[in-house]
Amino acid sequence: MNLWTKIFQPPRHIKEISDPELVKKQYKYWRVRIFYSMFFGYVFFYFTRKSFTFAMPTLIADLGFDKAQLGIIGSTLYITYGISKFVSGVMSDQSNPRYFMATGLIITGLSNIFFGLSSTVPLFVLFWGINGWFQGWGWPPCARLLTHWYSKSERGTWWSVWSTSHNIGGALIPVLTGIAIDYAGWRGAMFIPGIICIIMGFILIDRLRDTPQSLGLPAIEKFKKEDLSHPHEETTADILEEEAERELSTKEILFTYVLSNKWLWFLSFASFFIYVVRMAVNDWSALYLIETKNYSTVKANLCVSLFEIGGLFGMLLAGWLSDTISKGKRGPMNVVFSLGLLFSILGLWGTHDRSIWWADGAFLFIIGFFLFGPQMMIGLAAAELSHKKAAGTASGFTGWFAYFGAAFAGYPLGKVAQDWGWHGFFVALLACALIALLFFLPTWNASEQSLRKHSH
């Protein structure tokens, strides 16, 4: 047994509890405990992921770096995080989420502390790259827990509520770093999130567990007595038996259901450009407001918090509208929201010569609203528009493109802002939003049925 297996191996299933009342009571308790633990755990991952973003303006003043150098540091995280998201997904499937998620959070905390102790670009790149790799340990264990503890019929609701942890983390970190900078400079803005996340990592070890079966509880489908049949498929028993008999080969997943799936290519390219806009607004808008409108760090960061809060509402509404108005098709809402994104970016750019902080905050709120809807639904649509046995690979495929887009928002956009000023920056954002819209358009009527016609 190697060290990895010894530390991270999932616990064995234990004998199932026979008392139905005790099972019900235990399930209720553990579902609540597991959910709040992974929810707040992921909020804290955001603290160590975004600390540098909001420490940037003060770091420029202290160390004299230019935007291109800062862009290199920012891009490093997105590249290592993008690769890790895929690799860690495979690793996490064979690991106990209790230790996997906690270890990731503790190491991101340490990376932030070492970053705060550094003063040169190579060291910043090293520690921010390590941070990016272990940031990839946050999402996969949550996916495992959401799948094991919440049944198919309710998972959408739990998934959307869990997804708001991104926005809550994103909204809190500007405030936390703003206060830390006022009292302890940019280094304090790295130390404080780092220390908090190390503490939270140990709390996760205490609070989280693996599957229901590891606690003597039945599988969630058995507990919920859920009929897993699908309107387009044969009976549940037939399906389960067929799936047990034959898994798809890696070749089938990649070449039949992912690489040859036109919908995934459209979604992946859209994902690239949506993520350029998302990360550009998140990473550069505070600096834009400070440089062009002379806002204080706290006021600029408050405006960026509104971007995340807008995203929270947009995400929940987009999912609900795609279920009700467009009957489960994600394409129409992706197109409508992308159109709204174009106009809201134009609105923010239109206020460049006026310093009205509430107007800037309102436009950032609206941009977040229209951006986070399609960003959330790309992964959902990718999973739905591929074979169920290829859903993870399909989501990972769009995720790779997303984080290449995020990396593009670092050095390349930093260079654009450096050479062509903030007007050039906004032109680049508008171009990306328009291209994303064009890639969403062909997916307007995409559905499982249209995939079958395409595949056969």
Curated annotation (Swiss-Prot):
It comes from the Bacteria. Pfam families: MFS_1. The chain crosses the membrane at residues 34-54, 70-90, 113-133, 161-181, 185-205, 257-277, 302-322, 331-351, 362-382, 394-414, 421-441. One of its GO terms (cellular component) is plasma membrane. Gene3D superfamilies: MFS general substrate transporter like domains (1.20.1250.20). GO terms for biological process: phosphate ion transmembrane transport. InterPro entries: MFS, MFS_dom, MFS_trans_sf, OPA_Antiporter, Sugar-P_transporter_CS, Sugar_P_transporter. Keywords: Cell membrane, Membrane, Sugar transport, Transmembrane, Transmembrane helix, Transport. It is a multi-pass membrane protein. It is found in: Cell membrane. One of its GO terms (molecular function) is glucose 6-phosphate:phosphate antiporter activity. Belongs to the major facilitator superfamily. Organophosphate:Pi antiporter (OPA) (TC 2.A.1.4) family. Transport protein for sugar phosphate uptake. This is Probable hexose phosphate transport protein.
